[in-house]
Curated annotation (Swiss-Prot):
Higher taxonomy: Bacteria, Pseudomonadati, Pseudomonadota, Gammaproteobacteria, Enterobacterales
InterPro entries, alphabetized: AMP-bd_C (IPR025110), AMP-bd_C_sf (IPR045851), AMP-binding_CS (IPR020845), AMP-dep_synth/lig_dom (IPR000873), ANL_N_sf (IPR042099), CaiC (IPR023456)
Protein name (database record): Crotonobetaine/carnitine--CoA ligase
Domain of life from the UniProt record: Bacteria
Keyword tags: Ligase
Gene3D superfamilies named among the record's database cross-references: 3.30.300.30, N-terminal domain of ligase-like (3.40.50.12780)
């Protein structure tokens, strides 16, 4: 099924500007509460000016340009401005430090970076060290340092016309983006994403939550992340809806923002749901317009039920990863839901559970979740300059090995068990970290938890739990281990406990387990 045809992102924005004109496309709210509005026509003009800015800096079709930005309108301008001239955006996780950021610049062969004032000193140091291809920094900020190799984003953009100066031929198969995976367990890999991928994501994700042009899709997810781009932004823009981008997530501000913008759809990760539940209950908890809350793994049954009961919302399960572009398994519009299932495959995809010999397993048996799609269209195209990693993950016939363990039932509902790399091998038994985390999260004194395996000379691996307590609470090791012994099999009970003030997370909310080992 080809639902994109010959369309690319330049054509998309020209069409949207003509169809929706003065309708609000983008609303941005900063941490300071400042709000900016852009219509479809005005946003397209900003995108064109930004495309011309890059052209003036020597960027041409096929060139890579990095972005290291917090959520801001300029991210949207750059993302689509680069696509319009056939250049390739390389978003960098806004929480990465110098060595990690330099590694991405080096491995993506990127010479031009757009960043903002808080990150400038780090990149100036990288630039001066000369260990990466970085030769020019385009700075978004109130002032411009008088330094060579640095230009001011808004000064350059103000000099540009709002009609494109450079329009090279584009096809849907052209690369639009290299999005590096979060690298929570190892070095990140660059996921190559095409114009077709992004156009398809818009159609698919808008179908997934039955999005219409009168909807308002609000997100606090980071703009450099696949969820913000393909589940939220592309979905909203593809149907002419309004996309509300919040600079940073605040549990105290979230519901006020939902009400302020009359949001009808949003997306949440477990960390958000847990912190929202820690807020003092209010009489207006259910006073909102939300129709759907897109939800990503993992929540316990108790957490899910408590959240839906308190706020009067439906959690709409969506399972995917950077390589799948969208949530390829999930709850479908108008279809029944079966918690704790992650749902059923969406259109254009097939899914199977396979064993270690790569053979399909029958219902009820746990194996690897594998997805069939079309590389460069409904799945990522490849890993950037990593043919070895591409061949390991993606079969020639389009089957993607997710690395996740799961099973399916007789009706085709799929169930997520854990990341294969997130299983602890303990004395011959495979133990799911997610299973233990969901149980431990049920302790009334615990706010957050992560479980990892650590080396054990006798039993291969021992289990260690890191927990964050609710404010003002104390917890003894005896109480913790007693709770575990009462709620899980003996071989699953952690051997070690560490109480921390917080857990290391990346901008998408995933815990960085390698920082705990």
């Amino acid at each position: 099924m080809d639902i994109v045809g010959g369309q690319h992102l330049r054509q998309m924005w020209d069409d949207l500007a003509g169809i929706y004109e003065d309708k609000t496309a983008l609303i941005f709210e900063s941490c300071a509460g400042e709000v900016q509005h852009f219509s479809y026509a005005s946003l397209n003009r900003e995108i064109n000016r930004t495309a011309n800015l890059f052209y003036s800096l020597g960027i041409r079709k096929g060139d890579n340009v990095a972005l290291h930005l917090d959520n801001c309108p300029e991210f949207i301008f750059c993302w689509f401005g680069l696509a319009k001239i056939g250049a390739i955006v390389v978003p960098i996780n806004a929480r990465l430090l110098r060595e990690e950021s330099a590694w991405i610049l080096q491995n993506s062969r990127t010479s031009l970076l757009v960043t903002s004032a808080p990150f400038y000193p780090m990149y100036r140091q990288i630039q001066q060290e000369g260990r990466t291809p970085l030769s020019h920094i385009c700075l978004i900020g109130p002032t411009l340092p008088a330094e060579e190799g640095v230009s001011h984003f808004y000064t350059l953009k103000a000099q540009q016309p709002d009609v494109l100066l450079y329009t090279p031929p584009l096809t849907p198969d052209d690369t639009a983006e290299i999005l590096f995976t979060s690298g929570t367990t190892s070095r990140p890999k660059g996921v190559v994403i095409t114009h077709y991928n992004l156009r398809f994501a818009g159609y698919y994700s808008s179908w997934q939550c039955a999005l219409r042009e009168d909807d308002v899709y609000l997100t606090v997810m980071p703009a450099f992340h696949i969820d913000c781009q393909c589940t939220a932004a592309m979905a909203a823009f593809s149907v002419g809806a309004t996309f509300v981008l919040i600079e940073k997530y605040s549990a105290r501000a979230f519901w006020g923002q939902v009400r302020k913008y009359c949001a009808t759809v949003t997306e949440c990760i477990p960390m958000m749901i847990r912190t929202l539940m820690t807020q003092t209950p209010a009489a207006d908890d259910r006073h909102h317009c939300l129709r759907e809350v897109m939800f990503y793994l993992n929540l316990s049954v108790q957490e899910k039920e408590a959240f839906t009961e308190r706020f009067g919302v439906r959690l709409f399960t969506s399972y995917g990863m950077t390589e799948t572009i969208v949530g390829i398994i999930g709850d479908r519009p108008g279809d029944k839901r079966r918690w704790p299932s992650i749902g059923r495959p969406g259109f254009c995809y097939e899914a199977e559970i396979r064993n270690e010999q790569n053979r399909a397993l029958p219902p009820g048996e746990i194996g690897e979740i594998c997805i069939k799609g079309i590389p460069g269209k409904t799945l990522f195209k490849s890993y950037f300059e990593r043919p070895d990693a591409t061949a390991k993950a993606l079969e020639p016939n389009g089957w993607l090995h997710t690395g996740d363990s799961g099973y399916r039932d007789e009706e085709g509902f799929f169930y997520f068990v854990d990341r294969r790399c997130n299983m602890v091998k303990r004395g011959g038994e495979n133990v799911s970290c997610v299973e233990l985390e969901n149980i431990i999260a049920g302790h009334p004194k615990i706010q957050d938890v992560v479980v990892i395996g650590i080396k054990d000379d006798i039993r291969d691996e021992a289990i260690k739990a890191f927990v964050v307590l609710n404010e003002g609470e104390t917890l003894t090791e005896e109480d913790f281990f007693t709770f575990c012994e009462e709620n899980m099999a003996k071989f699953k009970v952690p051997s070690y406990l560490e109480i921390r003030e917080d857990l290391p997370r990346n901008c998408s909310g995933k815990i960085i387990k390698k920082n705990l080992k």
